[in-house]
Amino acid sequence: RHIFEPTVSYNYRPNPTVLRTKLQPFDAIDAIDKQNVIHYNFENKFQTKERAADGSLSTREIARIIPFFDTDLHTGRLRNAGMRMELRPYGWLGIEGDSMLDAESRHVDTTNLDFYLEKGPVRLAIGQRYVRDESSQLTAEIRWKLTQDLDVKFYERYEFETNDSKEFEVML
């Protein structure tokens, strides 16, 4: 079955009391500016019925796709557009992604795409991260669930622009 769920939200932020040009930039919060935006989400869920091992029927979500866009009420223009998606064609295979388009330049600003396989206690994942004019990264992860409360995880994030490892993580 297909479930369609549109939502609309409003975000208003008045002018900051201190101009951002007078702040020493520390992180993204220092670049916050006035905002008057309506955000539109159009969530689509696709579900199927599957027979469980005991013979009963259960519902499984096979896809969740959410196109969205923002309208700036100050200028009356489209500000951002994008899409988030989660695909589970099989219980053991998943694909997740998101992308953001700059409506003014009509360029893709960011894109993330991950493929993963899960079989029993093991999860293998590979992904791509892209930020326009800044970064193109590959991610890889291996996770093994040893017990209910104990996992082993290896994670690597590699940057193609500079040909080096940006992050390597081992977790227990």
What are these regions (language model features)?
Residues 1-171:
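Outer-membrane beta-barrel translocator/pore domains, especially the C-terminal barrels
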